Regions:
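Accessory nucleic-acid engagement/destabilization modules that flank
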Residues: 2-233
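Post-DEXD/H (motif II) to motif III coupling segment of the RecA-like Helicase ATP-binding lobe
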Residues: 387-396, 402-467
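Conserved Walker A/P-loop ATP-binding site and its immediately adjacent core
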Residues: 293-316, 331-334, 434-438, 510
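Conserved interdomain linker/interface between the two RecA-like ATPase lobes of SF2 helicase motors
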Residues: 449-513
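C-terminal helicase lobe and adjacent C-terminal extensions/tails of nucleic-acid helicase motors
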Residues: 125, 439, 491-494, 498-504, ...
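Conserved SF1/SF2 helicase motif Ia
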Residues: 282-309, 319-323, 422-423
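Walker A/P-loop
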Residues: 261-283
């Protein structure tokens, strides 16, 4: 028996009501699409199918029954004169409306109308559902006392009565469960909203016309599978050496000794020690045990994310039991990768045409590598941040170079890491140069237990803190030298490159790198000299990066043995990029970033046989002589961009008298010395601190660079 609806009461002061079946929700190929009832039913059915497909997985725990109500009711605001006027006129069907003049929008769109309608329908007793319904287009609305159903563009009492009749009909025909939102933790509300947005988008992709039947389970499942939103099958019985083609070192063995779903790992280990493989090894074990549904690898720059992307695809080919499994590259310019990736014989790309080719949807892919800002947008007030939160739910989230972010980004990361645990994620943080205070904050601890070991693996197992013991690693001495001006070392650098050494010269700004490159090529045109920075056009930059990272990478031995070279770069080669140099020249930088640069020296022992006999593991730091004078530092404080003069001066103080660094043993004591002496640096003017504002130390993060270059 069809549900019998009571007659509507029209008010001549408001637009006349349309019949419910004529209230359109969508257009289709330039003509009318399905009505509001069909779309609402389809959205709820799509949500239920998603929940059924993901049942038994980590993400499946977050398809809350209460979200069925929001999926069914989210577009009830489209039953309003203002929305129907808009869609009918857009389809050139205004003559079918029972009014003649266009209706001005007052309420703020159909999402706000949905919130106003539900607020009245539930007698102001379900604020979370109302807020979620109003936010399904990515913007959260807070209702005010002036918001009510009597606004003319909402149609008054007659249209509200029709909307409430539709709500009752959907409740009965969908058999919506008796449940509320009060039992759902506040931090999980965003991922609940994200699941509704996903169901809405998928149901909107169905080609439903005005007379189409309701979609059945076969259509719903095919839509989800076509989008690629299904759990992946992980191969079992694969060892670490099967995946990475080498046996795990002691640090990696320690990481794999304790696999804790939902924990926070902070892995501090030397540059080039295999932290990436350790993190991926943990991720594999969690996915194999069905304690994680995917992973997102977040890095500070586009270049580093692109290099990890290649390694992640190699990892997936070994671990995922599917033909050609691939990750998605996710950063501000990844559209170019999507467009060019793996074209077929007709020049088309399957990846480019995938459902995930959208910055808002890309994180929904089970496996991704990208910049950290893509994950941080789950925390900030941007459109559809809830979908990003839901996309991360249940995954392993690996954040590399966790030390490298500024104070603002660091505070967002601290908040994100805390929420990720509530979203069923396991978080793995990687760094070679993390301060103890930063470790405490990121690990979500009030106090950090005393432990000065290096390497150090901290595990926060839902509040239970453990340090996983790691044997002391092999150490290497690095010769240090400070040069006041680049003119003092040009001849030496050119001579050493001429003798076959691979020289890496890192500057702090693009302008400095360009100038050094210009001068070196003028002095030694016969030498192969390269330049990498973030201002190259994307196609040129990609070509340069691929060439040099292959040449100076783990497998570049044959080519590098042919002749020496000089590569001039900015911080894009500072971290998470696998390049190996015989000699490093670096402009002075904060101590932790200098260590990252030193990590490019003699990175692979397998290349030692092709190094020139005279090569020495050496770093030359370019630092002006006047750094010893606080007054001059104060005057020149803006010349250290993008870094604070304070941290440059502290770095100079700890390195100026060092002739040798023992890596990695010296990393922690040197960093501690660099951040411990705030009162040790004052200008000659009382009450002023050199290069910094205020009377308290700067944040633990000292780099002012953006996260994405």
């Amino acid at each position: 028996m069809p549900l019998r609806l009571p007659p509507r009461v029209e008010n001549p002061d408001y637009p006349k009501c349309l019949a419910p079946e004529r209230c359109l929700a969508k257009s289709l190929f330039g003509g009318p699409g399905c009505n509001v009832y069909t779309h609402s039913y389809a959205a709820c059915a799509m949500f239920r199918m998603l929940r059924a497909i993901w049942q038994g997985t980590r993400k499946g725990e977050f398809f809350f029954p209460a979200a069925e109500w929001c999926a069914a009711f989210h577009d009830i605001g489209k039953i309003s004169p203002v929305f129907q006027d808009k869609i009918y006129r857009a389809l050139q069907l205004a003559q079918q409306l029972p009014w003649s003049s266009p209706i001005a929008e007052q309420s703020g769109g159909h999402a706000r109308c949905s919130a106003i309608t539900l607020d009245a329908y539930f007698d102001h007793k379900n604020p979370e559902l109302i807020r979620m319904a109003g936010a399904h287009h990515g913007i959260s609305y807070e209702l005010t006392t002036g918001d009510n159903v009597n606004q003319k563009d909402l149609g008054g009492a007659a249209w509200q009565k029709m909307r409430e009749e539709m709500l009752r009909r959907l409740t009965i025909e969908l058999d919506l469960p008796e449940c509320g939102l009060n039992s759902i933790p506040k931090e999980q509300i965003p991922i609940m909203l994200g699941s509704v947005i996903l169901a809405d988008w998928l149901s909107s992709s169905l080609d439903l016309g005005p007379d189409s039947p309701l979609p059945d389970e076969t259509i719903l499942r095919e839509t989800i599978e076509k989008a690629g939103l299904i759990p992946h099958q992980v191969r079992s019985g694969i060892s670490f050496s099967d995946i990475f083609n080498f046996e795990p070192n002691p640090m990696q063995q320690a990481c794999l000794s304790q696999i804790v779903p939902g924990g926070i790992y902070v892995i501090e280990s030397g540059m080039g020690s295999g932290k990436t493989e350790a993190a991926l090894g943990i991720a594999y074990e969690l996915m194999r045990r069905k304690q994680a549904d995917g992973l997102y690898f977040a890095l500070p720059t586009q270049l580093t994310s692109e290099k990890i992307y290649d390694r992640l695809n190699d990892f997936l080919r070994k671990t995922i039991d599917e033909p050609d499994p691939r990750a998605i590259l996710i950063h501000g310019d990844s559209w170019l990768e999507w467009t060019l990736a793996n074209p077929d014989e007709n020049g088309n790309s399957d990846l480019a045409g995938s459902w995930f080719q959208s910055k808002k949807r890309a994180l929904m892919a089970s496996f991704g590598a990208g910049t950290v800002d893509q994950a941080l947008m789950a925390e900030v007030r941007v459109r559809h941040n809830a979908l990003r939160a839901f996309a991360l739910a249940g995954k392993v989230v690996i954040i590399d170079e966790i030390h490298s972010y500024d104070a603002y980004t660091g505070s967002l990361l601290t908040k994100l890491i805390g929420d990720l645990r509530s979203w069923g994620c396991t978080v793995i943080l990687l760094s070679a140069t993390l301060t103890s205070e930063a470790c405490r904050q990121f690990a979500q601890l009030n106090d950090l237990p005393d432990n000065s070991d290096y390497p150090r693996i901290l595990l926060n197992d839902h509040g239970k803190i453990a340090f996983i013991p790691v044997p002391a690693p092999e150490t290497h001495p690095v010769d240090l030298r400070i040069a006041g001006k680049e003119e003092d070392i040009f001849a030496e650098v050119i001579a050493r490159a001429g003798n076959g050494e691979q020289v890496l010269w890192i500057e702090n700004t693009v302008h400095q790198a360009q100038e050094i490159f210009r001068r070196l090529t003028a002095l030694a045109p016969e030498l192969e000299t390269g330049l990498i920075h973030s201002r190259f056009p994307a196609c040129i930059r990609r070509k340069q990066e691929d060439y040099w990272t292959e040449l100076l990478g783990r497998n570049g031995g044959a080519k590098r043995a042919q002749n020496g070279r000089i590569l001039v770069a900015t911080q894009v080669l500072e971290q998470s990029v696998d390049v190996d140099a015989d000699l490093l020249v670096s402009r002075i930088a904060p101590a932790d970033f200098l260590f990252q640069r030193i990590g490019r020296l003699w990175r692979h022992s397998g290349l030692n046989h092709v190094r020139p006999a005279a090569a020495a593991r050496q770093c030359i730091i370019l630092a002006p002589d006047w750094l010893s004078d606080p007054v001059q530092v104060e005057k020149q404080k803006f010349s250290f961009s993008p870094y604070s003069a304070y941290w440059i001066r502290r770095s100079w103080e700890v390195f100026q008298n060092k002739k040798t660094l023992i890596v990695p043993s010296d990393i922690r004591p040197v960093l501690s010395a660099a951040v411990s002496a705030w009162n040790g640096l004052t200008s000659t003017r009382p009450g002023r601190t050199t290069g910094c504002r205020g009377n308290s130390p700067p944040s633990q993060s000292r780099n002012d660079r953006r996260a994405v270059k």
